[in-house]
Structure formats: C-alpha cells, structure tokens
A protein has these predicted regions:
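Bacterial N-terminal signal peptides
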Residues: 2-10
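Short amphipathic, basic-aromatic surface patches that mediate peripheral association
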Residues: 53, 58-75
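Bacterial Sec-dependent N-terminal signal peptides
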Residues: 9-42
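Tryptophan-paired
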Residues: 81, 86-114
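Short hydrophobic alpha-helix segments
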Residues: 95, 131-132
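Short acidic/polar inter-strand loop motif in beta-rich domains
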Residues: 120-131
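Extracellular beta-sheet/turn segments enriched in Thr/Pro/Gly and aliphatic residues
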Residues: 47-57, 133-159
Length: 159
C-alpha cells in the first residue's frame, strides 16, 4: 500500500496546475556567424584551395584529407557550406568539394605532429561546427582517407 501511494503522489506532483497544454520542443539557439573568409595558406590569400605545394607556405609539412560529414548532417549540405583546417586560431587549409558532392578534399599545412581541428560552416543556419572525432595529427606528406573511403568527421556546434 505504501509503494502504491508513493507512485500516485509522484505522478500527481508532475501534473501542471490545471494546464492541459502539450509541452513543445524548443530548438536550441547558437551563435550565428557571417560567412567566414577562411584563407588557404597555399593560395596567397585566396579562400579556395589551388593544390599548391608546401613550398609556397611557411610550413615544412602538409597532408591531404578526404572528409565526409556524418549521415545526420549530410542532408543539410549546401554548395555555400565551407570546411577548413585550423591549428589554434590559424587557418591551415580550406577544403574543396565538387558541387552537390558529399566528399571534401583538404590539403592541410603546418608542422609534423601538430593537432588540427576542422571547422565546418553551415550556411543555411550560419553555424560553425568544430571537429571532435577523430583526432587529427598532421603528418608530413600524410593522407587520411581517400575519395572512395573518406574519413567521417563528427562535429559539435560552437556555442
């Protein structure tokens, strides 16, 4: 009898004060950003990758990555979206992606063993996401993924 009473009391305390409204989901809001003008270090200030060599940059190493977003984010891809690589706050590469394709190619410049974070700009929401998985460590003349088997990079929206 005591257990039954506790359950009834807990249900009664969860009800609203005579309010029969259905709770509504409120989408979280995040900081919106204007279109970032990320500059590729190999392109002399241009914001597109030109496939230049690492000799055109002040860095001794470069690597190539083929990247895709997780399935949950692919449905929202647009041709206005951007992807870039960073070491701290410094842009180390800007990705290219053929129109309406899901695979990004990015050449990343820096020094061997530097930790790299990818940033993804989702143009329709004006959100910037940071990569959280996998860990990306720059390796000289290295490669992560291929066009046919790209690395899936999981992202978290910047708040």
């Amino acid at each position: 009898m005591m257990a039954t009473l506790a359950v009834v009391v807990s249900f009664a305390s969860c009800s609203s004060s005579g309010d029969n409204e259905t709770p509504t989901y409120k989408e979280p809001t995040y900081t919106q950003h204007e279109d970032p003008q990320w500059e590729d270090p190999s392109a002399g200030g241009s914001s597109t990758t030109t496939g230049g060599s690492s000799s055109a940059t002040p860095y001794s190493s470069d690597m190539t990555m083929y990247v895709q977003l997780p399935d949950s984010m692919k449905a929202y891809l647009s041709n206005a979206d951007k992807l870039a690589a960073f070491c701290g706050a410094e842009c180390r590469g800007v990705a290219t992606r053929p129109a309406n394709d899901e695979v990004w190619m990015i050449r990343i410049y820096g020094e061997a063993n530097e930790e790299i974070t990818l940033k993804y700009y989702r143009a329709d929401k004006k959100y910037i996401y940071d990569s959280v998985e996998p860990q990306i460590v720059l390796s000289n003349d290295g490669q992560m993924g291929t066009y046919d088997d790209p690395v899936t990079v999981f992202m978290r929206v910047e708040e």
